[in-house]
A protein has these predicted regions:
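Non-membrane alpha-helical structural segments and their capping/turn regions in soluble enzymes
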Residues: 112-117, 176, 199-202
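A cross-domain feature marking catalytic cores of carbohydrate-active enzymes
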Residues: 47, 74-76, 98-100, 140-142, ...
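Active-site beta->alpha N-cap acidic-glycine motif
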Residues: 21-110, 121, 125, 134-135, ...
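CE4/NodB-like, metal-dependent polysaccharide N-deacetylase domain
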Residues: 60-73, 94-95, 112-144, 151, ...
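His/Asp/Glu-enriched short active-site or ligand-binding loop at hydrolase and phosphoryl-transfer sites
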Residues: 144-146, 150-185, 217-228
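Catalytic grooves of carbohydrate-active enzymes
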Residues: 186-224
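N-terminal membrane-anchoring alpha-helices
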Residues: 1-34
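A short acidic, amphipathic alpha-helical/loop segment
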Residues: 58-59, 84-88, 148-152, 204-208
C-alpha cells in the first residue's frame, strides 16, 4: 500500500512539474501575464517567430485596415535579416517583443548565463535595428519556463507575456478550424497567440478580428494597456 501511494505521489509531482514548465500561465517558475486583468471586452493579439518577408506584410495590411495594434515577438536573428520590415511593424503602431536571439529548441536546457546571453543578444539586435522604443516584453521560446529561466530574468526588467488562447496555427492546417478554435475561446482579457509565417495567417487574423469587433471587443497593445515602459 505504501509503495502504491508512493508511486502515485511521485507521479503527481512529475505531472505538476511538467504542468509548471509547459503551461506558461501557471506562473510557478516565472511570473507571467497570460490574461489581461479585466472583465471588459478587451483582447490582445500577439505574433511569434517572425517577421516573415512575405506573410508579415499581409498581416500588417489586415491590422492597419481594422486599426488594430499588436505585439510581435521576434527572434533577434530574424530582426537582423528583416530590418526594414521590422521597422515597418514599429512605424505602424505595433511593438517588437524579445523572443530570444535564435529561438533554439534547446533554450529550455541552457544554463541561466547562456539564457541571459540569448535574451541580451536579441535586445541588442532590436536596438541595432533602430527600434529603441521597444518595451521590455519577453516571451520564452515555446512558452516553456523553469527555475533556470527565472534566474536568467532576475533584475532584467522584463515583463514575461504568455497567452490564454493558443491558436495552434503551426499544427492545424485548415484555417477554418483555426478560426473556430480561437473564436470559441475568446473571453474578456484574452491574449491570443498566432504566428506570422503561415501562408493563411492573414486570412485567419482578419476573420478573428471581424468576429471580435462584431461582438463589441476592442483590441489593445499589451504594453500600453499594462502601462509598461521601456
Amino acid at each position: 500500500m505504501i509503495t502504491v501511494i508512493g508511486i502515485f505521489s511521485g507521479a503527481s509531482v512529475v505531472a505538476f512539474l511538467v504542468y509548471a514548465s509547459f503551461y506558461i500561465g501557471s506562473g510557478v517558475y516565472v511570473k507571467t501575464v497570460s490574461r489581461l486583468p479585466t472583465d471588459k471586452k478587451i483582447l490582445a493579439l500577439t505574433f511569434d517567430d517572425g517577421p516573415h518577408h512575405e506573410i508579415t506584410p499581409l498581416i500588417l495590411d489586415v491590422l492597419k485596415k481594422y486599426h488594430v495594434e499588436a505585439v510581435f515577438f521576434c527572434p533577434g536573428e530574424n530582426i537582423e535579416k528583416n530590418t526594414l520590415l521590422t521597422r515597418r511593424i514599429m512605424n505602424e503602431g505595433h511593438l517588437i517583443g524579445n523572443h530570444t536571439n535564435r529561438h533554439s529548441a534547446l533554450f529550455p536546457f541552457y544554463s541561466s548565463k547562456r539564457m541571459k546571453t540569448e535574451i541580451d543578444d536579441s535586445w541588442n539586435r532590436i536596438v541595432s535595428a533602430g527600434l529603441p522604443d521597444s518595451s521590455r516584453l519577453f516571451r520564452p521560446p515555446f512558452g516553456i519556463t523553469n527555475p533556470t529561466l527565472r534566474k536568467a530574468l532576475r533584475n532584467s526588467g522584463y515583463t514575461v507575456i504568455g497567452w490564454n488562447i493558443r491558436s495552434l496555427d503551426t499544427i492545424i492546417k485548415d484555417p477554418v478550424v483555426v478560426v473556430r478554435r480561437v473564436t470559441r475561446r475568446i473571453r474578456p482579457g484574452s491574449i491570443i497567440l498566432f504566428h506570422d509565417f503561415n501562408y493563411y495567417a492573414a486570412e485567419i487574423i482578419e476573420r478573428v478580428i471581424i468576429y471580435a469587433l462584431k461582438r463589441g471587443y476592442v483590441f489593445v497593445r499589451l504594453d500600453k494597456y499594462l502601462g509598461i515602459r521601456n
